[in-house]
A protein has these predicted regions:
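Charged, terminal alpha-helix-loop-beta segments
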Residues: 1-277
Length: 277
């Protein structure tokens, strides 16, 4: 499989190290042949631009990105041909009463099924131009379960994701947030404080996952409007009108998106036929 985590190197999504292993001569020849075909098609038509990116060798696409070993493209997941199977396995997992958040993390990271967590991009307006997934990203003394980095025409933005128990005390009888959601929210408060106080130190480690001599300014100049947070806990059945009201308030007041695991499943299913994240 193209998507496979390297044991002991959680930050690398792939078997191949796309930083150390540069595109081969054969891969570059294939790439240049496709570029030639694109130019010829434009010449015959006389206008516009032809892009056959889906045909470019993966090594070329990843190596050319900001973070080669964390770069994702939706059509790669789709070409694997097992998205539907993975989605149904995920659905069964989250609805198993014995499943906890570590089981979910293990499934996404080691099955692997990164498109499931990348589905969080569908709640935002970035990620369709460029997208990255970093599992277990260190923020000082804290660890975010996932950091998603996505690009739109406005540049790069960041989503820190915390996974909590799918079958824990998610909500109270009233529908308001229970212990599980509060735990995730408190964790995000700590992340926010760490990023705001030590942005440069928090983000300096990300440079070692890049093969570029410099990164866009979004990675060195803190802009709170580019930072987003998400907590995933519980299932659809745990939510009622009060829960959804709390959810709306938390997004508008604290920039924290609260999701249940069925939301992840729904978005993962949408990605089976989507054009972009």
């Amino acid at each position: 499989a193209l998507f496979d985590i390297i044991r002991g190197s959680i930050m690398n999504l792939y078997k191949r190290d796309y930083i150390k292993s540069v595109p081969t001569k054969q891969e570059m020849q294939l790439y240049e042949g496709i570029l030639c075909t694109e130019r010829k098609a434009v010449g015959d038509r006389g206008f516009g631009k032809i892009n056959h990116r889906r045909l470019y060798p993966a090594a070329v696409r990843h190596y050319d990105s900001l973070f080669p070993n964390n770069h994702i493209e939706l059509f790669d997941f789709q070409n694997e041909g097992n998205m539907e199977q993975l989605n149904e396995e995920f659905c069964a997992l989250i609805h198993d009463a014995n499943t906890n958040e570590r089981n979910v993390l293990r499934f996404i990271n080691h099955r692997p099924a990164y498109h499931i967590i990348a589905g969080v991009f569908k709640y935002y307006n970035f990620g369709h131009h460029d997208a990255y997934v970093f599992p277990e990203f260190a923020l000082g003394k804290y660890i975010a379960d996932y950091l998603l980095i996505g690009k739109s025409s406005g540049g790069y933005e960041f989503v820190f994701v915390e996974l909590e128990h799918p079958n824990g005390r998610t909500t109270l009888k009233s529908g308001h947030e229970g212990e599980t959601f509060r735990k995730g929210t408190y964790q995000i408060y700590d992340w926010k404080a760490e990023i705001e106080a030590h942005f440069s130190a928090s983000f300096v480690t990300i440079t070692k996952y890049s093969n570029k001599s410099s990164l866009p300014k979004e990675f060195s100049e803190y802009d709170s409007s580019r930072f987003h947070y998400a907590v995933v806990a519980g299932l659809r059945e745990d939510y009622n009108e009060a829960t959804y009201r709390d959810r709306r308030n938390k997004v508008t007041q604290q920039n924290i998106l609260t999701l249940h695991y069925d939301n992840l499943y729904d978005k993962a299913c949408e990605l089976e036929t989507a054009q972009s994240f």
